[in-house]
UniProtKB/Swiss-Prot annotation:
This is 2,3-bisphosphoglycerate-dependent phosphoglycerate mutase. It is an enzyme of class 5 (isomerase). The record marks H181 as: Transition state stabilizer. Substrate binds at residues 7-14, 20-21, 59, 86-89, 97, 113-114, 182-183. InterPro entries: His_Pase_superF_clade-1 (IPR013078), His_PPase_superfam (IPR029033), Phosphogly_mut1 (IPR005952). Homodimer. Belongs to the phosphoglycerate mutase family. BPG-dependent PGAM subfamily. Gene3D superfamilies: Phosphoglycerate mutase-like. The gene is gpmA.
Length: 227
């Protein structure tokens, strides 16, 4: 069995080196090209999908659409879920990473970005960019909508969707594409690969590059590689 992850192509805020999180930004020109190249590469290597899962953020949805279009599979059903959203970066969202490091120190920013269990400063629920004010999340209980997350909380958010939707799809024989975000994919990778809390800090997933997992019947990883 195989599973393909793809992190969305470069976003406009990736290009500007800003913290993004749940803020909804578009793909950059480079990001659009990365997604198209990924779709073509998947087609060239014979990858076909029966279902695709993505987040409710534009950059991941757009990447999913482009990948499927470029691989002549735009007909493949897509399921969009908030559970595959990027990690919520709280008050850091929209800030310049370099300037934030100058203000708080490189080590503090590294911990905020890569630590498994350290939360960023939380965003106020009344902030104009709070997810509580976004109709994408209006159906969710207020205590479920995050104001800031670490990777541990992100995994706790993503894991129920893996167990309820993604894993059963793979086990039923479906060929699955997951188009999501750096940290939601890191969280899934941690679970699938059994990566330790310490080692997950060093895992980077590049934008726009298909990551293939070959899995056994228990969804244990047999092989992992980028196309």
């Amino acid at each position: 069995m195989e599973l393909v992850f793809i992190r969305h192509g470069q976003s406009e805020w990736n290009a500007k080196n800003l913290f993004t999180g749940w803020r909804d930004v578009k793909l950059s020109e480079q990001g659009l090209a990365e997604a198209a190249a990924a779709g073509k590469k998947l087609k060239e290597n014979g990858y076909e999908f029966d279902i695709a899962f993505t987040s409710v953020l534009t950059r991941a949805i757009k990447t999913c659409n482009i990948v499927l279009e470029e691989s002549d599979q735009l007909f493949v059903p897509q399921i969009k879920t908030w559970r595959l959203n990027e990690r919520h970066y709280g008050q850091l969202q929209g800030l310049d990473k370099k300037q934030t490091a100058e203000q708080y120190g490189d080590e503090q920013v590294r911990i905020w970005r890569r630590s498994y269990d350290t939360l960023p400063p939380l965003l106020d629920k009344d902030d104009e960019f709070s997810a509580h004010k976004d109709r994408r999340y209006a159906h969710l209980p207020a205590d479920v909508v995050p104001d800031g997350e670490n990777l541990k909380v992100t995994l706790e958010r993503v894991l129920p969707f893996w167990e309820d939707q993604i894993a059963p799809a793979i086990l039923s024989g479906k060929r699955v594409l997951v188009a999501a975000h750096g940290n939601s994919l890191r969280a899934l990778a941690k679970h699938i690969e059994g990566i330790s809390d310490k080692d997950i800090m060093g895992l980077e997933i590049p934008t726009g590059q298909p990551l293939v997992y070959k899995l056994d019947d228990n969804l244990k990883v047999l092989e992992k590689f980028y196309l």
